[in-house]
């Protein structure tokens, strides 16, 4: 019988080393395979993410123009669509005399107007049409009206009323809002004949202040002059030369102010006359009575914390009745005099409207007509009382509101 050769201890060690080497090779190969598989998986994953990111980016950056406008954009566009047909451009001419001849030129101070009746009444700023020898009105559809008359002016508010001869044409008047209810921060839209060249330019912004007094330099159709206005609405909606007389609108498309002035020493500040200040005179004009402005006959200063401290009143807001220079606080024979108002009274309400918060005495009285009876809530010697006043008609040259 053949016998297998016996392995020596050295041979056994060599065999074990060979087996271990094979095992290590297998492990190394497996590790390499695992690394390859993981790398491929990561590559596929990253490609997928990149592809999804590209799709997302393409979804967000639309080039087909189908993205819906925001609610804010839609609101401004809706107001513009609704109101633009009721806003007109005004172009004036004047006759200037020289030592040699009389020349006629077109004024550079073109303006804007608001249609306030179906039969052709327009409201604008007085300085836009003052001393004009002829006036042309251009509607938003391009229709030109050359037969235009100034039918009334309210110089205290820089307001003028025009009448167009429209024949059988029915115009679309703008709806008037309530300027006593406007709030700081409220969104507004302005429309006007910007720079006298760009008809129905639309801008938007917010009400940035209320009750602002402004001394404005206006050129209009004559030499530059200064006009002092009170209780104006301040806005950051862009209002440019040529926008004077145009509407300041709320988001419902209602007129809450008539644009009148721009702060030349600051950007983003414009002013508008509260619409309530012209409602009374508008009623009289539409009734064919011309401008009849309601009159109280009291001189006052609007209270601030500093003024209240100076005059020694406990009232926080309102109109403090006081003398103005050498002029008495109450105009003799005026409605205020007949109703028994006194110096140092504080007018806190006119009917239900709060003086100060909702306007000053001038603009709040402007909503009424001569002959109207209003209830004034006053603070006298620390006690509140109500007096009834029958307003009279303002006569040019009278002072006091």
Please report, for each region that a protein language model flagged, where it lies by residue.
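Flexible, small-residue-rich helix->loop connector segments that border functional cores
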Residues: 77-79, 344-347, 376
């Amino acid at each position: 019988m053949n016998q297998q050769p016996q392995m020596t201890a050295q041979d056994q060690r060599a065999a074990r080393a060979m087996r271990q080497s094979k095992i290590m090779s297998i492990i190394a190969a497996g590790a390499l395979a695992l690394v390859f598989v993981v790398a491929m998986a990561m590559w596929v994953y990253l490609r997928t993410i990149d592809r999804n990111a590209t799709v997302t980016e393409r979804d967000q950056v639309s080039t087909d123009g189908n993205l819906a406008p925001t609610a804010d954009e839609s609101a401004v566009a809706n107001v513009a669509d609704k109101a633009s047909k009721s806003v007109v451009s005004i172009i004036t001419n004047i006759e200037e005399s020289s030592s040699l001849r009389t020349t006629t030129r077109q004024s550079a101070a073109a303006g804007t107007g608001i249609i306030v009746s179906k039969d052709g009444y327009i409201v604008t700023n007085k300085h836009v049409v003052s001393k004009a020898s002829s006036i042309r009105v251009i509607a938003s559809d391009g229709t030109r009206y050359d037969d235009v008359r100034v039918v009334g002016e309210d110089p205290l508010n820089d307001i003028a009323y025009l009448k167009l001869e429209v024949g059988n044409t029915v115009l679309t008047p703008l709806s008037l809002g309530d300027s006593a209810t406007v709030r700081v921060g409220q969104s507004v839209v302005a429309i006007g004949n910007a720079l006298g060249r760009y008809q129905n330019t639309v801008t938007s912004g917010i009400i940035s202040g209320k009750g602002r007094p402004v001394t404005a330099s206006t050129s209009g159709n004559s030499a530059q002059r200064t006009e002092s206005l009170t209780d104006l609405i301040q806005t950051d909606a862009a209002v440019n030369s040529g926008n004077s007389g145009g509407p300041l609108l709320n988001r419902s498309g209602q007129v809450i102010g008539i644009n009148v002035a721009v702060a030349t020493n600051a950007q983003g500040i414009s002013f508008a006359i509260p619409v309530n200040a012209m409602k009374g005179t508008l009623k009289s004009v539409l009734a064919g009575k011309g401008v009849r402005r309601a009159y109280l006959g009291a001189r006052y200063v609007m209270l601030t914390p500093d003024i209240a401290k100076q005059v020694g009143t406990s009232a926080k807001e309102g109109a403090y009745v006081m003398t103005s220079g050498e002029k008495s606080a109450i105009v003799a024979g005026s409605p205020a005099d007949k109703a028994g108002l006194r110096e140092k009274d504080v007018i806190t309400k006119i009917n239900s409207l709060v003086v100060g918060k909702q306007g000053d005495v001038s603009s709040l009285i402007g909503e009424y007509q001569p002959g109207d009876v209003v209830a004034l809530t006053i603070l006298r010697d620390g006690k509140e009382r109500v007096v009834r006043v029958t307003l009279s008609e303002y006569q040019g040259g009278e002072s006091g509101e």
